[in-house]
């Protein structure tokens, strides 16, 4: 990390504001340059992005299947940047309901002239409705924001109202008939997101990279277990297999893809915090996964 980037990353956001040090920063990742806006509180963490296990997965599927990459829960463009690292010429569609994040993403796309990239300012769900978005106090671009009220009991939240839609209703507007990969990181509402894309998934059979969280220590373990059982039944109906992604010590590489038939019933802790990512793959395409491990 360069000295100026290190100094910026150590400064509190408010101090950077006072010193007018929130101008976009030109970042080089693996000899590729991208300009990163720093005008939002947690955007400083984008300075740390580098190639990771996720870059491997995105690059593999966009290479073999083409089509648009769908980023559900785009937040501050963390996955957008990793997608850009694979091949900036590919098409990207991000879904994000948080207004602060939407403005940031649009700026990121605009200042880097990322043609073929766009953000749709809605959340995804299993019906078209307005929902409350629970955002941690004083974190306007909260990466852990959720529409699940009791996902993390005891935390203090600001509540915003967001428009949510079914992916099946939005997809025709994307003017494409091919999806290379769907990434879902929606802090507990992955079941409803997937239910809302049933018609599209059954027709196109895209691979899906999805975070499924372990239960918060203060939350209802059996409630989360029941939701995950419904999720497994949905994937079975689609004839999809589930693989848990096992990463190396610094999450730069995938070391194993563990096929599972159910999600673990356990609380989140430091030992399992990096085991929340899964690949949902059509059963007939399971053999493709062997190539990911040998890239």
Annotated model-derived regions:
Residues 32, 47-70, 130-132, 146-204, ...:
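Short internal loop-to-helix segment that lines adenine-nucleotide cofactor pockets
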Residues 1-166, 172-176, ...:
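S-adenosyl-L-methionine
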Residues 164, 225-238:
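Short alpha-helix
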Residues 205-212:
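Conserved beta-strand signature within the Rossmann-like core of class I S-adenosyl-L-methionine
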Residues 120-122, 240-249:
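Conserved S-adenosyl-L-methionine
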Residues 74, 124-126, 167, 186, ...:
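Hydrophobic pocket-lining residues within nucleotide cofactor-binding pockets
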């Amino acid at each position: 990390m360069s000295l100026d980037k290190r100094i910026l990353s150590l400064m509190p956001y408010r101090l950077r504001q006072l010193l007018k040090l929130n101008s976009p920063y030109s970042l080089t990742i693996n000899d590729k340059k991208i300009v990163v806006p720093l005008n939002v509180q947690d955007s400083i963490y984008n300075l740390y992005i580098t190639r990771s296990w996720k870059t491997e997965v995105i690059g593999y599927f966009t290479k073999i299947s083409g089509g648009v990459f769908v980023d559900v829960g785009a937040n501050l463009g963390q996955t957008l940047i990793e997608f850009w690292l694979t091949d900036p010429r590919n098409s990207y569609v991000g879904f994000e309901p948080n207004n602060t994040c939407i403005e940031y993403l649009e700026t990121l796309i605009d200042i880097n002239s990322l043609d073929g990239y766009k953000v749709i300012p809605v959340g995804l769900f299993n019906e078209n409705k307005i929902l409350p978005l629970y955002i941690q106090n004083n974190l306007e671009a909260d990466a852990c924001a959720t529409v699940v009220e009791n996902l993390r009991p005891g935390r203090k939240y600001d509540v915003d109202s967001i428009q949510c839609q079914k992916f099946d209703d939005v997809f025709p507007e994307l003017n494409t008939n091919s999806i290379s990969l769907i990434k879902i990181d929606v802090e507990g509402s992955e079941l409803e997101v997937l239910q809302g894309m049933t018609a599209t998934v059954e027709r196109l059979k895209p691979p899906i990279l999805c975070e499924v969280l372990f239960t918060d220590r203060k939350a209802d373990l059996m409630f989360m277990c029941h939701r995950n059982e419904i999720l497994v039944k949905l994937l079975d109906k689609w004839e999809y297999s589930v693989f848990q992604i096992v990463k190396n010590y610094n999450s730069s590489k995938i070391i194993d893809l563990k096929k599972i038939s159910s999600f673990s019933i356990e609380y989140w802790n430091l030992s399992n915090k990096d085991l929340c990512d899964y690949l949902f793959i059509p059963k007939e395409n399971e053999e493709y996964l062997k190539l990911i491990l040998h890239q």
